[in-house]
From Swiss-Prot:
Source organism superkingdom: Bacteria
Record-linked InterPro entries: Enolase, Enolase-like_C_sf, Enolase-like_N, Enolase_C, Enolase_CS, Enolase_N
General function of this protein: Catalyzes the reversible conversion of 2-phosphoglycerate (2-PG) into phosphoenolpyruvate (PEP). It is essential for the degradation of carbohydrates via glycolysis.
Cofactor: Mg(2+)
UniProt-listed GO biological process terms: glycolytic process
Protein's UniProt name: Enolase
Record's cofactor remark: Binds a second Mg(2+) ion via substrate during catalysis.
Keyword Kinase: no
Primary location recorded for the protein, binned into one broad class: cytoplasm
Binding locations of Mg(2+): 245, 288, 315
Active site: 208, 340
GO CC field: cell surface; extracellular region; phosphopyruvate hydratase complex
């Protein structure tokens, strides 16, 4: 196997994401003519501690959301340093960009510029070696197909409705394989659409392909999903479980949680009890961002109450950042981390966060963003690191389905070597 393959060109362009906003796409060319291409996603509800996504701010073009500055940074500053480097040395590539940027949050070059380059380099390396991306990143050990965490009802910032909690999801942890899990979710999605229609609700979809009806309460979203699970012929809490992403930082005001759609304002203790009641009443296996990103006390309360039986995922809380995660581990808050590549900005730092989480007994959930592209890197990443769970939207909208289809290909390629862990993916809670 080759041990040095030179980078000969690094080039970026501005493309569109699934929300009609510009984003960065990068091509990396190698001495043997191989090319790797990667496109960068973007979030709607972003954590305050995420790495900086560089936008142009020119209101006359794309409402100020252009990324030509980030593109230029790739084509000049970053390209000048990386051309001539060994594409197989991912750590050196990412370290070089981090040093070039010189800030704590990638504000100079932009995390969107750096991530595009980081991922394009990994893809170029894999292509040059004739390997799948998951094999290149994970080696011979990358073999676990993930349980989908599939968003089928949208609220909050992902939809224009009166539902406060941002995402209501299903997890087919009782499925025997990934392909069967995907089939189950697809059938529930269709059952949910017909159930909503029958009850007179709108079946328009949100950013991530989930439906966005004007339901009477957050709890009604859970009830209608359970009805759809049963209608599809499955057993809630056995075949398929419920997962929530309240995105609580978005409803946290003056130390309290404002459930405006329900006309309720709750203290952190009351909010924790709200989740406790839901978890006792319904088969909820995972809650993401149940508390706000700076409400460490609230997180502690929630973890002490249900952290032994519900997966508590830190997204805005941890932002794929080892410093934030280390603090959470020391304080004993949450028991899982959401992994979003663009929150931190390089593949190396992403892998470091996953490794830290797993060493501490935290699960890792690899995730998309609400503004996505046809790029399928996260499908390969989740298998490479054996994370066991992926969050990438409803089985609708091609930028979401692209990830699921890539996982079907990987499952086929792994054949008997592949493993779908189902409930075993939730190894740190009592189910």
């Amino acid at each position: 196997m080759k041990n040095y393959i030179e980078i000969v060109d690094v080039y970026a362009r501005q493309i569109l994401d699934s929300r009609c906003n510009p984003t960065v796409e990068v091509e990396v060319e190698l001495e043997d003519g191989t090319v790797g291409v990667a496109a960068v996603p973007s979030g709607a509800s972003t954590g305050a501690f995420e790495a900086v996504e560089l936008r142009d701010g020119d209101k006359s073009k794309y409402l100020g959301k252009g990324v030509l500055k980030a593109v230029d940074n790739v084509n000049t500053i970053i390209a000048d340093e990386l051309v001539g480097m060994n594409v197989l040395d991912q750590v050196a590539i990412d370290k070089t960009m981090i040093e070039l940027d010189g800030t704590d949050n990638k504000a100079k070059l932009g995390a969107n510029a750096m991530l595009g380059v980081s991922l394009a380099c990994a893809k170029a390396a894999a292509n040059s070696l004739g390997m799948s991306l998951y094999q290149y990143i994970g080696g011979v050990n990358g073999k676990v197909l993930p349980v989908p965490m599939m968003n089928i009802i949208n609220g909050g910032k992902h939809a224009d409705n009166n539902v406060d909690l941002q995402e209501f999801m299903i997890m087919p942890a009782g499925a025997p394989s990934f392909s069967e899990a995907l089939r189950m979710c697809s059938e529930v999605y269709h059952a949910l659409k017909s159930t909503l229609k029958a009850q007179g609700y709108d079946t328009g979809v949100g950013d991530e392909g989930g439906f966005a009806p004007n339901l009477k309460s957050n709890e009604e979203a859970i009830v209608v999903i359970i009805e759809a699970i049963k209608k599809a012929g499955y057993t809630p809490g056995e075949d398929i479980f419920i997962a929530l992403d309240p995105a609580s930082s978005e409803i946290f005001e003056d130390g309290k949680y404002n459930l405006a759609g329900e006309g309720r304002v709750l203290t952190p203790e009351e909010m924790a009890n709200y989740y406790v009641e839901l978890a006792e009443k319904y088969p909820i296996i995972s809650i993401e961002d149940g508390m706000a990103e700076e409400d460490w006390d609230g997180w502690k309360i929630l973890t002490e109450k249900i952290g032994n039986k519900v997966q508590l995922v830190g997204d805005d809380l941890f932002v794929t950042n080892t410093e934030r995660l280390s603090k959470g581990i020391k304080l004993g808050v949450a028991n899982s981390i959401l992994i979003k590549l663009n929150q931190i900005g390089t593949l190396t730092e992403t892998l470091n966060a996953i490794e830290m989480a797993e060493r501490a007994g935290y699960t890792a959930v690899v995730s998309h963003r609400s503004g996505e592209t046809e790029d399928t890197t996260i499908a390969d990443l989740v298998v490479a690191v054996n994370a066991g769970q992926i969050k990438t939207g409803a089985p609708a909208r091609s930028e979401r389905v692209a990830k699921y289809n890539q996982l079907l290909r990987i499952e086929e390629e792994l054949n008997d070597m592949g493993e779908y862990r189902g409930l075993k993916a939730f190894y740190n809670i009592n189910k």
